[in-house]
């Protein structure tokens, strides 16, 4: 095991036995959702993973150790004000200080890969921000997807982003974007961005075969499995886009950027939509967790079926 890695006994036992495990990020606790919805949702996500046959492994940094699998007390600790938001660049700094931090998509992928977890469920990936031509703001999640072999089950990229440019970036870096039950890339709060995906999977087994084919071929890097928000929870596309545009304009006027930008935008969206964005966010998180668990189950089964038997020892030649 890696020096900085601490795997919860339940997760370690599942991995050793080849049982399905789903990685979960922790920034939704510290930055993504307000209290008390943050802890309630994190626990509900873990329950959704279990209900669909897999073991949840929420990931964070605590006391300078990457923790793979948390208990309720750990989650409560992450909800404390001032918890750091940890992406790839931040991991060495937080680990070296022995500090705490909640992991983004990128950092969660790194930890999942170190632990041997193939499937990670989250709300939405980061991507190319609107106005990138002046800000240069591109999420580290995209480069992580290009290099780290973990499948990310999500409702597309966060609605605050430039979706066409995000998909172009993923195409350039060779990251397959697969629609789960859809031919269109989801737009987070609503089901159809009007942009096509690279391929479609209609069952967990279909998705598992894509994962298996890519990695058995030796192609490093992740896969985006894009799952539309449940229809009953989706927001009206025009209203959601109007709220996003207003929030982005307010951020630009206020000079909000860097790590503070996404939490600011999500908070403003909650206000501008009268709380509807928070309800939608929770619904898609739970749905993605359930789908991710079913894909993890199918992938674990497929790995067992396709694992080659160990080569028998060479037979001894008779001696005369």
UniProtKB/Swiss-Prot annotation:
Known catalytic reactions = D-ribose 5-phosphate + uracil = psi-UMP + H2O
Cofactor: how bound = Binds 1 Mn(2+) ion per subunit.
What are the required cofactors? Mn(2+)
Among Pfam families, the record links this protein to:
Indigoidine_A (PF04227)
Q: Report the EC number(s), separated by commas if there are several.
A: 4.2.1.70
**GO molecular function, one example?**
metal ion binding
Residues that hold Mn(2+) according to the record: 137
Q: Which GO terms describe its biological process?
A: nucleobase catabolic process
Q: What class of enzyme is it?
A: lyase
An example of a Gene Ontology cellular component annotation for this protein is: cytoplasm
Which InterPro entries does the record match to this protein? Indigdn_synthA-like, PsuG
- The identity of this protein, by name, is Pseudouridine-5'-phosphate glycosidase
Q: Which organism is it from?
A: Rhodospirillum centenum (strain ATCC 51521 / SW)
Q: What is the lineage of its organism?
A: Bacteria, Pseudomonadati, Pseudomonadota, Alphaproteobacteria, Rhodospirillales
Chain's gene name: psuG
């Amino acid at each position: 095991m890696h020096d900085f890695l601490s795997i919860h006994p339940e997760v370690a036992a599942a991995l050793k036995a080849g049982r399905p495990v789903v990685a979960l990020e922790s920034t939704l606790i510290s930055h993504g959702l307000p209290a008390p919805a943050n802890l309630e949702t994190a626990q509900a996500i873990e329950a959704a993973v279990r209900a669909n046959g897999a073991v949840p492994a929420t990931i964070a940094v605590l006391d300078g150790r990457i923790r793979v699998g948390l208990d309720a007390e750990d989650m409560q600790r992450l909800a404390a004000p001032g918890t750091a938001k940890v992406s790839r660049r931040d991991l060495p700094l937080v680990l070296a200080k022995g500090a705490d931090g909640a992991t983004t998509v990128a950092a969660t992928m790194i930890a999942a890969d170190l632990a041997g977890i193939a499937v990670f469920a989250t709300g939405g990936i980061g991507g190319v921000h609107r106005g990138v031509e002046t800000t240069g703001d591109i999420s580290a999640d995209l480069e992580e997807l290009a290099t780290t072999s973990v499948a990310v089950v999500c409702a597309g990229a966060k609605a605050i982003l430039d979706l066409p440019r995000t998909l172009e970036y993923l195409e350039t870096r060779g990251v397959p974007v697969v629609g789960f039950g859809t031919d269109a890339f989801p737009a987070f709060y609503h089901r159809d961005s009007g942009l096509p995906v690279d391929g479609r999977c209609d069952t967990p087994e279909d998705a598992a075969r894509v994962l298996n084919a890519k990695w058995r071929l030796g192609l490093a890097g992740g896969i985006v499995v894009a799952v539309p928000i449940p229809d009953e929870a989706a927001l009206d596309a025009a209203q959601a886009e109007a709220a996003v545009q207003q929030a982005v304009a307010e951020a630009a006027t206020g000079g909000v950027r860097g790590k503070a930008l996404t939490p600011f935008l999500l908070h403003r969206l909650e206000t501008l939509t009268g709380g509807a964005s928070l309800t939608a966010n929770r619904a898609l998180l739970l749905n993605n967790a359930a789908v991710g668990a079913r894909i993890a189950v199918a992938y674990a089964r497929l790995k067992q079926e396709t694992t080659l038997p160990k080569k028998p020892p060479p037979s001894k030649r008779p001696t005369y």
